[in-house]
A protein has these predicted regions:
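Conserved GNAT acetyl-CoA-binding A-motif
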Residues: 126-139
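Conserved acetyl-CoA-binding loop-helix of GNAT-fold acetyltransferases
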Residues: 105, 111-124, 149, 153
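Acetyl-CoA-dependent GNAT
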Residues: 10, 14-101, 106, 119-120, ...
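Terminal substrate-recognition subdomain of acyl/acetyltransferases
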Residues: 2-6, 153-157, 161-169
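Accessory recognition modules or surfaces
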Residues: 112, 135, 143-154, 169
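Short phosphate-binding/catalytic loops that engage adenosine nucleotides
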Residues: 114, 131, 156
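Flexible, active-site-proximal loop/turn residues at the rims of small-molecule/cofactor binding pockets
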Residues: 92, 109, 140
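Short, flexible, glycine-rich and Lys/Arg-enriched loop motifs at helix boundaries
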Residues: 39-47, 136-148
């Protein structure tokens, strides 16, 4: 028995208002292990000050990014339902730079090429819209390792950044 998983047939299309609840729900399930990893790295005291209710904050961040007129939002659809999404900011940080703002894949569909397809779609979208550079940011903790692997495979160059935290009280 092979451990390889067959890539999933998906369509990527602009996100519609009716997709938003499903996208928020899948994003929360997708990021649960990521936030758990961040909590393990930072410890409870710092994590809970930064993210007292990460689910509510993250749900609002996804809704806001998807509704933002300054962003382009797309959804990956398989079997008639959203299985992933991405929001893209054009001229982010610098003129001519496009950014993958938020990207997420339903855990039931991870490791089937959805994140890679959304990333490549995003890069192509930025190129078509006249961007010269694409950027994406992610964490350096173990929970973000799958995302880093996707961006490495997509040809992004890593710029290591260090962010330190210290509890003051």
């Amino acid at each position: 028995v092979s451990s390889a998983v067959t890539p999933l047939e998906i369509d990527i299309r602009p996100l519609e208002a009716g997709d938003l609840d499903a996208v928020v729900e899948l994003s929360l399930r997708a990021w649960a292990p990521v936030f758990a990893s961040v909590q393990q790295v930072l410890g409870d005291a710092i994590f809970l000050r930064l993210h007292p209710d990460w689910r509510a904050t993250q749900a609002e961040a996804v809704r806001s990014s998807c509704r933002d007129e300054e962003r382009d939002a797309f959804v990956a659809v398989a079997h008639g339902r959203p299985v992933g999404f991405v929001t893209i900011a054009l001229n982010a940080f610098h003129r001519g730079m496009g950014a993958i703002d938020i990207i997420g894949v339903d855990p039931d569909y991870q490791r089937r090429g959805v994140g890679s397809r959304l990333t490549e779609f995003s890069v192509d979208h930025m190129r078509r819209r006249g961007m010269d550079i694409a950027v994406v940011e992610t964490g350096g903790d173990p929970g973000h390792a799958p995302a880093r692997a996707v961006y490495d495979a997509a040809g992004f160059t890593l710029l290591p950044v260090a962010r330190y935290f210290r509890l003051l009280r």
